Amino acid sequence: MNYELVFLAAGQGKRMNAQKNKMWLELVGEPIFIHALRPFLADNRCSKVIVVCQEEERKHVKELMSQLNVAEHRIEIVKGGSERQYSVAAGLERCGTGRVVLVHDGARPFITLDIIDRLLIGVEQSKAAICAVKVKDTVKRVMNGVVQETVDRENLWQVQTPQAFELPILRKAHQLARKEQFLGTDEASLVERIPCPVAIVQGSYYNIKLTTPEDMPLAKAILGELGGIAND
């Protein structure tokens, strides 16, 4: 099954305390951006990549794409919005007539083809599928610095990206959110409101989002582990 990809790289990464977009921070000699995008470029089912970035970084993205020898017809660069949801909407406007679209956070550099495979199976069966992992830690609801309750984690999942949807479904979800002025934290939260069932497929505990400086040493360790697995 072919798909188009909306690749989000417009975030400012303020929590990373970097002086630049965290996409351009290097992880073992290459920008996070490249690590996150490479698996999709290697996947022949990915027919088009729509990179959503800040306008002032468009030239830099083009240069990186040229270095990677990516065919021009396969890449389109669009300006991001003030919120994640608006950036996704901008990307969706540039999607073609394909059936399926994946949305991925560029700050997640450890996506694997296995996860993409599971998502494509999930979206074929359910029209909407997201990858996630079971919550491991005890979770508590807190108000004003005081624990209110311990949440039953049995049915709690940590949601990741990519997230996969039939293109008309995700477009409809964004139209509804815009009409009702709803701002969600991921695409699934919009699709759920249509309503449309969203299937869960197994993600990976390695598939972390790089958000704060503390994540970088962990990312280097994960990259080393994944490299070791690949070389076994």
UniProtKB/Swiss-Prot annotation:
User: One biological process GO term for this chain?
Assistant: isopentenyl diphosphate biosynthetic process, methylerythritol 4-phosphate pathway
Q: Does the keyword Plastid apply?
A: no
The EC code for this enzyme is 2.7.7.60
Q: In which pathway does it act?
A: Isoprenoid biosynthesis; isopentenyl diphosphate biosynthesis via DXP pathway; isopentenyl diphosphate from 1-deoxy-D-xylulose 5-phosphate: step 2/6
Q: Which Gene3D superfamilies match?
A: Spore Coat Polysaccharide Biosynthesis Protein SpsA, Chain A
Tree of life domain = Bacteria
**Catalysed reaction, written as an equation:** 2-C-methyl-D-erythritol 4-phosphate + CTP + H(+) = 4-CDP-2-C-methyl-D-erythritol + diphosphate
Under PANTHER family, the record lists: 2-C-METHYL-D-ERYTHRITOL 4-PHOSPHATE CYTIDYLYLTRANSFERASE, CHLOROPLASTIC (PTHR32125:SF4)
Family of this protein: Belongs to the IspD/TarI cytidylyltransferase family. IspD subfamily.
Q: Report the protein's function.
A: Catalyzes the formation of 4-diphosphocytidyl-2-C-methyl-D-erythritol from CTP and 2-C-methyl-D-erythritol 4-phosphate (MEP).
HAMAP family linked: IspD
> What protein is this chain from?
2-C-methyl-D-erythritol 4-phosphate cytidylyltransferase
